[in-house]
């Protein structure tokens, strides 16, 4: 658990290959959010580790989040790949990456969930917004996982939900040989406890062989 350390202090002991904590997966962070205005659990990734992930990094970030969703009881999580718009354009790199990730899912390179994107935030969490824009999607309006374009967008989104929408959350790092609790130094005891509970679920799933360790 991070506690009062700076993030780079804790992760500096995890990220180097020599530390022996790495796997073939990219290390990434997932916020598990309980948002009063949203009818389901919401996972947001990556808002703490990967600053500006590329396509391959995002693929692993999605895989990590899907694995966590399975542990939390979401059998086939719906993954919304966020951007500022819901159409693919060469002017916005995140829309191209979103389209590529969806095709990777179509080809079996990403499994265990349903992916769609690019989707703007409103389309991802509001069925009415998606219908108004005439977006036909199995994910729109009912996303379980939000894959954000970069760390800045994700960090602001998670904190806005907490401070402006009354959300409560937990934070965990996946992709290493062991799960890691990673919360903000400003987080409450309740948030730290919730994060530890999520970590315990992941650790149990690893122990029973139901969580990937690659």
Segment roles from a protein language model:
Residues 1-139, 143-214:
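Anion-binding alpha/beta catalytic cores of soluble intermediary-metabolism enzymes, centered on
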């Amino acid at each position: 658990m991070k506690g009062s350390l700076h993030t780079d202090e804790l992760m500096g002991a995890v990220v180097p290959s020599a530390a022996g904590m790495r796997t073939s997966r990219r290390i990434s962070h997932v916020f598990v959010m309980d948002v009063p205005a949203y009818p389901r659990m919401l996972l947001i990734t990556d808002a703490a580790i990967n600053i500006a992930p590329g396509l391959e990094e995002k693929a692993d970030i999605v895989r990590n989040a899907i694995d966590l969703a399975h542990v939390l009881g979401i059998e086939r999580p719906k993954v919304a790949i966020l951007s500022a718009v819901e159409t693919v354009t060469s002017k916005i790199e995140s829309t191209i990456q979103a389209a590529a990730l969806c095709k990777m899912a179509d080809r079996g390179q990403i499994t265990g969930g349903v992916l769609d994107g690019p989707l703007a935030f409103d389309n991802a969490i509001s069925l009415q917004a998606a219908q108004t824009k005439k977006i036909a999607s199995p994910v729109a309006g009912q996303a379980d996982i939000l894959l954000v374009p970069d760390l800045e967008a994700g960090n602001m989104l998670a904190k806005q939900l907490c401070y402006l929408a009354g959300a409560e959350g937990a934070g965990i790092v996946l992709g290493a040989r062991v799960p890691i609790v990673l919360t903000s130094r400003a987080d409450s005891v309740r948030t730290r406890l919730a994060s530890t509970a999520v970590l315990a679920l992941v650790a149990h799933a690893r122990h029973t062989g139901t969580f990937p360790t690659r």
